[in-house]
Regions:
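Beta-strand-turn-beta hairpins that frame and shape the catalytic cleft
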Residues: 1-3, 92-102, 143-150, 171-175
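Conserved beta-sheet core of the metallophosphoesterase superfamily
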Residues: 84, 107-181
Length: 182
């Protein structure tokens, strides 16, 4: 099974269109959205082409393949316009081997700017904590939580490490993919 993992769209129609083109090309079985879908938040500058009303139908067209969690910039009003559940703080997936993928935005569990999770939930050894929030790509073993893999796809629209990106999980491995400008 192939998962495309994206986070921190923040209402950018331009970058959502780029993401949709990537989804068309990648043909994932499921799309994981790690929160902060429509609103840019008070600490972020407006992303390129900030038009949440254009983002809504783009995401709704993919609703049957989306698994989403709530970000710190998501609100109940977002659920009124999105055709897939978006208000859960976390979700859990299991890959073909039984490996647990714990999906969360990250803010609830203390995602830090230095590739850390302050309050990781108790997970079986070999599990992966898949999170967003920091807008920085991560793909590494946790030093603070032995046996836990950390993966952050970075940000679709407001990267803090220079490159707009998403992630892929397939065959037990995570990877980052850079979204190119048109």
């Amino acid at each position: 099974m192939k998962y495309l993992i994206a986070s921190d769209i923040h209402g950018s129609a331009y970058w959502t269109e780029r993401l949709c083109a990537a989804i068309e090309s990648e043909q994932p079985d499921r799309i994981v959205l790690l929160g902060d879908l429509l609103y840019h938040g008070p600490r972020n500058d407006l992303p390129c082409d900030y038009v949440p009303k254009r983002v809504i139908p783009l995401l709704n067209a993919l609703a049957d393949r989306i698994i989403a969690v709530r970000g710190n910039c998501d609100a109940e009003v977002d659920q009124m316009v999105l055709d897939f559940p978006v208000m859960a703080d976390y979700a859990t997936l299991f890959d073909e081997t039984g490996r647990e993928l714990f999906l969360t935005h990250g803010h609830v569990f203390g995602a830090g700017m230095h590739n850390s999770i302050d309050h990781a939930p108790a997970l079986p050894e070999g599990s992966a904590l898949v999170y967003g929030h920091t807008h920085i790509k991560v793909n590494e073993a946790s030093e603070a939580h032995p046996g836990l893999w950390l993966f952050n796809p970075g940000s679709v629209s407001i990267p803090k490490d220079g490159a707009h990106s998403y992630g892929i999980y397939e065959g037990g491995a995570f990877s980052h993919v850079i979204l190119e400008e048109e």
